Amino acid sequence: MVVCAAAVLALTLFFKVESVEVTGNSRYSAQEIQDACGVQLGDNLYLLSKPDMVQRLHQRLPYIDEVRITRSLPNTLRVQVTEFTTVYAVEQEGTVWLLTSGGKIVETAAERGDVPLIDGCELLAPSLSGDVSFALELQNRQESLFALLTALESAELTGDVRAIHLGDPTVLSMDYTERFSVEMPYSADYPRLLRYLTLVIEELETNLTGVIDLTRDGEPHFRPN
């Protein structure tokens, strides 16, 4: 018991936070991240709760995606973050809601600007740092949307997306670059369809515009304008 008490006393007296090192940040400053964590210089390094700090970061700084917090003895706390860089816009009742490919609402805006638009859906009770939710009857469209956004991100194709349309109950369509409308089914293998899309575009003349139909399994079709 004496040894345990001495160990606890040592942890309390020593290992005070003298510096907080933040890496991976661009949108938020290191000080903003430290403040959001709730860490102050002089706090005990071992009495800080890492799960609580991660939760506060996600709640207070919506663009934070992944967080890794480590202790570096004797007195440094390291916070490594990744931030969401691609967002999409849903316009609803005069407000533009910006959301990530993972379905997190990160910001509101008065105007959409050049952010890719998602239409044909309605957000239920949207709130900052909250998760996107569609009406129950649109759950299939919601799941398909975020499966597509995840696939676009993995394929590094997000920069060419101009808009995604969910208004048609049978076909999900996407405005891609300034040249194409891409038609896809809901609940599809989107990584595979995006590979088809890339191959089709590579075969087309650079001045062609039109519709790329990916709704027929394994048989892409191009309809020129």
Protein language model annotation of sequence segments:
Residues 3-7, 15-26, 46-99, 146-149:
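Periplasmic polypeptide-binding modules associated with outer-membrane biogenesis and secretion
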Residues 137-192, 198:
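Soluble extracytoplasmic domains of inner/organellar membrane proteins
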Residues 82-161:
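Extracytoplasmic segments of membrane-associated envelope/inner-membrane machinery
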Residues 24-26, 37, 81-85, 110, ...:
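Flexible glycine-/small-residue-rich
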Residues 16-18, 29, 53, 60-65, ...:
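Envelope-exposed proteins and targeting segments
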Residues 23-63, 114-143, 187, 192, ...:
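Periplasmic/extracytosolic POTRA-like scaffold domains at the N-termini of outer-membrane
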Residues 42-44, 65-66, 75-76, 85-88, ...:
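Short beta-strands and strand-coil junctions in structured, solvent-facing domains, enriched
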Residues 178-225:
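Extracytoplasmic/luminal low-complexity segments enriched in Pro/Gly and acidic/polar residues
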